[in-house]
Amino acid sequence: MIKLQKYSYLSHKYLILDTIEDCFSKKDLNFMHIPREEIGYIEFIRKDKIIIITYLHIYTSYRHKHYGYQVIDYLFSHYKFKCIVGETLKESRGFWNKCIRKYNGMRRNIYYSDNYTSLFVIPRQEISYKQIWDLLDYSYNIIY
């Protein structure tokens, strides 16, 4: 089970922590002082009930263990929003294509930065290109 912990000085950056709370009670965990493993980080902003993911990074030693899907599931279960919007890096196209299929999303052929190939919307929502462009512009102005 994973948890997101807010990074100390950035309001849009969260550490992804792996916990073992399924096996033990919180009282036992506090007694044992078992540290949570940091498996990566995610940067996202919420605006108008839409989550804009700017970066999701899982450390290489934790890849291929389905932590990316757990992060998306965590966002769905802990935040109230209509959809997730984000751009796709060339290296992570396979992961986001699987997420698009799994969560009934869609891909749009628009990108704000040269490093990215396209954009995704999970789950499928009717969003205009202008609204997507405004969301990406908003996120880049705040984060970068």
List where the protein language model places each region.
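Conserved N-terminal entry element of GNAT/NAT acetyltransferase domains
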Residues: 1-15, 138-144
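Short secondary-structure junctions
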Residues: 3-6, 101-111
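Conserved acetyl-CoA binding element of GNAT-fold acetyltransferases
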Residues: 49-60
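Conserved acetyl-CoA-binding loop-helix of GNAT-fold acetyltransferases
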Residues: 58, 64-77
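Conserved active-site tyrosine of GNAT-family acetyltransferases
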Residues: 96, 100
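C-terminal "cap" of GNAT-fold acetyltransferases
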Residues: 109-144
